[in-house]
Amino acid sequence: MTLSPLLLPLQLLLLLLFSGAVCRAEAGPETESPVRTLQVETLVQPPESCTESAAIGDTLHIHYTGSLVDGRIIDTSLTRDPLVIELGQKQVIPGLEQSLLDMCVGEKRRAVIPSHLAYGKRGYPPSIPADAVVQYDVELIALIRANYWQKLLKSILPLVGIAMVPALLGLIGYHLYRKASRPKVSKKKLKEEKRNKSKKK
């Protein structure tokens, strides 16, 4: 009989722990963690006749609707002309650009984009808060394929621009060197040469 007063607090403690575990199990899983990777879902399948899909360098005409996860629309092109972008030129947020790769004309996709591939820690006040996950529904209206020479030119042009700086500096240095290495003619000699030329005339 002396053990029962000691067991009572232990029984109460076990009862509390067990009831807490039951309550957590009934509440279900904790709230979802924020989206960390790009999630792309096809809403309208590409036509079977699709032979060309979007690739880096191509020009795309797209209609889109961007929204926050709570459903608030942040931007849409449905009330105006389609947006024209060139893939690979960073004209839209990275997550949206990645979701457009391999898309066919007539296809429609939904992209759920984590903040680090969207507007990041700054957001885009006032419509997009910091660290916001955004969702874009995108339809590819038209695709203009970049030819081989256009792609080559666009990849080489920045390199040519970078190479021009040292080339120009080299030319300037060479010009200054040639100018400095010429024998200096005195002013007196120059005057004499001018007089001699004028006498000959």
From Swiss-Prot:
The catalytic activity, as recorded, is:
[protein]-peptidylproline (omega=180) = [protein]-peptidylproline (omega=0)
Q: Which GO terms describe its biological process?
A: chaperone-mediated protein folding
- Where does the protein principally reside? membrane
GO molecular function annotation = peptidyl-prolyl cis-trans isomerase activity
Q: Which Pfam families match?
A: FKBP_C
Q: Where is the PPIase FKBP-type domain?
A: 57-144
Q: Where in or outside the cell is it found?
A: Membrane
Instruction: Please state the span of the N-terminal signal peptide per the UniProt entry.
Output: 1-27
Membrane topology term reads: Single-pass membrane protein
Q: Which InterPro entries match?
A: FKBP2/11 (IPR044609), PPIase_dom_sf (IPR046357), PPIase_FKBP_dom (IPR001179)
Any one annotated GO CC term: membrane
Quaternary data: Interacts with IFITM5.
Q: What does this protein do?
A: PPIases accelerate the folding of proteins during protein synthesis.
* The protein's name in its UniProt record: Peptidyl-prolyl cis-trans isomerase FKBP11
- Organism this protein belongs to: Mus musculus
